[in-house]
Design a protein with these regions (language model features):
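Bacterial N-terminal signal peptides that target proteins for export
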Residues: 1-8
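Bacterial Sec-dependent signal peptides at the C-terminal "C-region" and cleavage site
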Residues: 14-28
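N-terminal Rossmann-like NAD(P)+-binding domain of SDR-like oxidoreductases, especially those catalyzing
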Residues: 11
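Active-site mouth of glycoside hydrolases
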Residues: 25-154
Length: 154
């Protein structure tokens, strides 16, 4: 029997949500002492949006034909060198629909690289902004001077 990773993640999330809501103190604000203790245990978060320089959009970042671990490693290394420790990374439903196993493998590879550079990741699941049409495969060239010129609706 083949398991769908998306369904497993959704089921795990629902169970975790239900289990977490059983706590009676979940709705109580933290004391100043508890908040200060939590903050003292966590480094200051400094980061940015991340997409490797070799990818015009989230499809090129994640599809097998253009996934570029070497560039990701190099650029996350640069981020670490200047003190960044968190990245916001956009996922692609188009890649998920066309090659789900490879997509999960690429996410795992990205996370391994990010961990090597002590960088946490905030994934954005299937953003639906920017260019309304997206297609799997080769992507258009960037438009000079326009930020995210090839970003696609997801």
């Amino acid at each position: 029997m083949k398991h769908n990773p998306f369904i497993l993640v959704a089921l795990f999330s629902l169970v975790s949500l239900f289990w977490g809501c059983q706590s009676s103190d979940i709705y109580q604000p933290w004391s100043k002492e508890k908040a200060k203790a939590w903050y003292a245990e966590h480094p200051y978060r400094a980061g940015c949006n991340f997409q490797p320089s070799t990818a015009i959009n989230q499809i090129e970042m994640w599809q097998s034909a253009t996934f570029d671990a070497a560039t990701i490693d190099r650029e996350l290394g640069w981020a670490e060198e200047i003190g960044l420790n968190v990245m916001r990374v956009y996922l692609s439903s188009v890649v998920w629909q066309n090659e789900p196993e490879a997509f999960i493998q690429h996410i795992d590879e990205y996370l391994t690289i990010a961990d090597k550079h002590h960088i946490k990741t905030l994934f954005v699941f299937f953003d639906d902004c920017w260019n309304p049409e997206s297609t799997y495969g080769e992507q258009p060239a960037p438009k000079p001077g326009i930020h995210n010129s090839g970003w696609v609706q997801d």
